[in-house]
A protein has these predicted regions:
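Aromatic-lined glycan-binding groove of carbohydrate-active enzymes
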Residues: 62
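Conserved alpha/beta core surface patches that mediate binding of polyanionic ligands
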Residues: 87-89
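Basic/polar, cationic surfaces and motifs that engage anionic cell-wall
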Residues: 1-36, 70-73, 78-85, 96-193
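Active-site acidic/histidine clusters and adjacent loop/turn architecture
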Residues: 22-23, 29-58
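Short, solvent-exposed loop/turn and secondary-structure capping segments
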Residues: 47-49, 78, 91, 121
Length: 193
């Protein structure tokens, strides 16, 4: 268990003890290989607001799998599940020439501009629990927990968001649960199937 969250998801749907129902995909899991952390670069917002912004750009829906609130549109630290996650649909959050980070990366966006401010303590706690859960469930090693800027040149997730701190916090959540932390495998080794 990870702080009350079961470490395994079923292949598709169905209740799992201790896991928020919305975290359980309705479709067979994708072969997730990494987690990509973003900031919204806005002082406020939430999944609904970002979905509207993404649709205005011509996208089919919210590009992230999860959004973590900062207390503006949603409760501070609240994890919102985007419509892509239940369907296990590829992301639209980290475009590269070969699209591997969208195809194989779970996109998590924290509300806030972390070039200016720091994420809240509640956001970091929620992020570390979610990342630990996803690492354990999908066998994602710590070095495949990335900032958007690790996938291409961008300031996202901001100068005040430490991805190294997220990795450490998630590793601590796993250690406290008795779950092993998988050794690193070099983020550059994410290959297309």
């Amino acid at each position: 268990m990870i702080d009350g969250i079961s470490p395994m998801l079923p292949a598709a749907g169905g209740p799992v003890a201790g896991v928020p129902r919305e975290w359980i995909p309705n479709a067979s899991p994708r072969p997730w290989r990494c987690i990509v952390i973003h900031h919204s670069a806005t002082p406020s917002g939430g999944a609904a607001a970002f979905d509207k912004m993404h649709r205005a750009k011509g996208w089919d829906e919210l590009g992230y799998h999860f959004v973590i609130g900062n207390g503006t549109d949603t409760r501070d630290g609240q994890i919102e599940v985007g419509p892509r996650w239940p369907k296990q649909k590829w992301g639209a959050h980290a475009k590269t020439a070969d699209n591997r980070y969208n195809d194989y990366g779970i996109g998590i966006c924290l509300v806030g501009n972390f070039d200016v401010d720091r994420p809240t303590a509640a956001q970091m706690r929620s992020l570390s629990k979610l990342v630990a859960y996803l690492m354990r469930t999908y066998h994602i090693p710590a070095d495949r927990v990335l900032g958007h800027g690790d996938t291409k040149p961008t300031d996202c997730p901001g100068h005040h968001m430490s991805v190294a701190a997220v990795r450490r916090m998630a590793a601590q959540v796993l250690a406290d649960s008795g779950a092993p932390v998988e050794p690193g495998s070099q983020a550059a080794a994410i290959e297309r199937s």
